[in-house]
């Protein structure tokens, strides 16, 4: 990136992504410990997989920060304990988290467009992944046979 202001904006956006993804690690790990009932095993496995993927996403964002000469954040994104552990509540909170992460990647894309092919491609790749996560959670929240996207 040529412009120092844009470089700083990109590093800040990447740090926000890293923080959001690290919050996802904690969130999904917590959820995996709070699932009970007949469907526990596949749901716990799915949640643990999301925690692992969030960690990989955080690491990738951190690598981008250092590639640009920045310092990766030690902060973690917002974590609110709702004390609701019904699987529907967990999935609704997961959907909000995924949408929030998606917004962070869109913010990065706006900064990168026309300034860095590397960051543009990274942001686009991650937007695709996050949109797939949003869709997956949305489908899990639907009643069997519902074709319309879930809306609260």
Sequence positions of predicted segments:
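Iron-associated oxidoreductase/ferritin-like identity signal
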Residues: 1-152
């Amino acid at each position: 990136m040529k412009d120092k202001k844009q470089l700083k904006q990109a590093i800040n956006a990447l740090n926000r992504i890293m923080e959001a993804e690290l919050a996802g690690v904690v969130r999904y790990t917590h959820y995996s410990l709070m699932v009970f009932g007949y469907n526990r095993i596949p749901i716990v496995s799915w949640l643990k997989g999301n925690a692992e993927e969030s960690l990989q996403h955080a690491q990738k964002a951190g690598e981008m920060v250092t590639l640009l000469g920045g310092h990766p954040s030690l902060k973690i994104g917002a974590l609110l304990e709702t004390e609701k552990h019904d699987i529907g509540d967990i999935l609704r909170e997961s959907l909000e988290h995924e949408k929030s992460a998606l917004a962070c990647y869109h913010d990065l894309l706006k900064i990168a467009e026309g300034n860095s092919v590397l960051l543009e491609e990274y942001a686009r790749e991650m937007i695709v992944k996050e949109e797939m996560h949003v869709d997956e959670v949305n489908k899990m929240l639907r009643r069997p046979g519902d074709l319309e996207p879930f809306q609260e």
